[in-house]
Amino acid sequence: MIIDTTEVQAINSFSRSESLKEGYGLIGMLVPIFTPVSGITIGVLVIVWLEREISAGIQQRIGPEYAGPLGILQALADGTKLLFKEDLLPSRGDIRLFSIGPSIAVISILLSYSVIPFGYRLVLADLSIGVFLWIAISSIAPIGLLMSGYGSNNKYSFSGGLRAAAQSISYEIPLTPCVLSISLLSNSSSTIDIVEAQSKYGFWGWNLWRQPIGFIVFIISSLAECERLPFDLPEAEEELVAGYQTEYSGIKFGLFYVASYLNLLVSSLFVTVLYLGGWNLSIPYIFIPELFGINKTGGVFGTTIGILITLAKAYLFLFIPITTRWTLPRMRMDQLLNLGWKFLLPISLGNLLLTTSSQLLSL
């Protein structure tokens, strides 16, 4: 039997090209996944470092300084430590609920990043119901916390899970009319359209000036959603040890830790998008685009500037929840619920009524 060498070479080249196509296809699938995940991870590490440095300054002490330059790698060292710690399971608890709870909390918050625009058209999912999708997704996280508390078979954990669910429901309801007011002003529920609607009048076109009452209610509700002081009732150390986290250790405890800061970053980014103009700088780029012929709303330069502006606004806003943590005392549970149902909800509904009336009169 005579083997044609040209046919063998053709078969080999074809198989090589097919394997290269498969490799490029796999890389093309992984890059869009790992790029936002890496960016979010770095963002969380920066938040942890900022909180430790600001907290150290408020308490007049030295913050982390040994792990990396200025202690910026301290959070990474803590995460590595938790990764190698023993993962203990409660002997009489529901292991499935106990294990699934932290994952649900983290995944639901990660999905919220899909509708956040970091620059001009730089968003994973530009949906017409973007802001309301975020509200719907954020409602899933308390279910994971309640599952964690129930699966632990511990009275402190279960009480913390119930508190987390009650707190989330109480403050998500006043938060929704604030978002609806912004949608009415922008004539859209898309996060891209909301940012572009604020770019018409520069700095004075921000929704912060058109919705000051809604802005305050949104901030308070966001802090309660993130379970930050003075709203950290589900994790009150003096009453519940650590709340729904009491029985957790190792990487599962680390997931709750990450979810807390992920939620804080999501809230800050949505404050930036809804009230602070998003990626718009609101002042001219000082002749740089005109000098080099760069488009302000597109291209590499415009996209990079938009990302930097969005992150700068979000991280500047983070000073409010960080300083609030070391300023205000923890509220009681009855005070927490009264604030949400008796004060914030009527105020947000009144603000929505005023916004609707003004929009109808302007037609």
Curated annotation (Swiss-Prot):
Catalysed transformations (reactions): a plastoquinone + NADH + (n+1) H(+)(in) = a plastoquinol + NAD(+) + n H(+)(out); a plastoquinone + NADPH + (n+1) H(+)(in) = a plastoquinol + NADP(+) + n H(+)(out)
Coiled coil: none
Record-listed E.C. numbers: 7.1.1.-
GO molecular function terms noted in the UniProt entry: NADH dehydrogenase activity; oxidoreductase activity, acting on NAD(P)H, quinone or similar compound as acceptor; quinone binding
UniProt GO BP: aerobic respiration; photosynthesis, light reaction
Localization: Plastid, Chloroplast thylakoid membrane
Residue intervals passing through the bilayer: 30-50, 98-118, 127-147, 248-268, 300-320, 336-356
Enzyme category, top tier: translocase
Keyword Repeat: no
Predominant location category: plastid
Annotated membrane topology: Multi-pass membrane protein
PROSITE patterns in the record: COMPLEX1_ND1_1, COMPLEX1_ND1_2
InterPro entries named among the record's database cross-references: NADH_UbQ_OxRdtase_su1/FPO, NADH_UbQ_OxRdtase_su1_CS
Nucleotide-binding found in the keyword field: no
Key words, A-Z: Chloroplast, Membrane, NAD, NADP, Plastid, Plastoquinone, Quinone, Thylakoid, Translocase, Transmembrane, Transmembrane helix
Gene Ontology cellular component terms for the protein in this record: chloroplast thylakoid membrane
Pfam families noted in UniProt: NADHdh
Function: NDH shuttles electrons from NAD(P)H:plastoquinone, via FMN and iron-sulfur (Fe-S) centers, to quinones in the photosynthetic chain and possibly in a chloroplast respiratory chain. The immediate electron acceptor for the enzyme in this species is believed to be plastoquinone. Couples the redox reaction to proton translocation, and thus conserves the redox energy in a proton gradient.
Membership in a protein family: Belongs to the complex I subunit 1 family.
Quaternary structure, from the entry: NDH is composed of at least 16 different subunits, 5 of which are encoded in the nucleus.
UniProt-recorded name of the protein: NAD(P)H-quinone oxidoreductase subunit 1, chloroplastic
Organism, as annotated: Drimys granadensis
Gene: ndhA
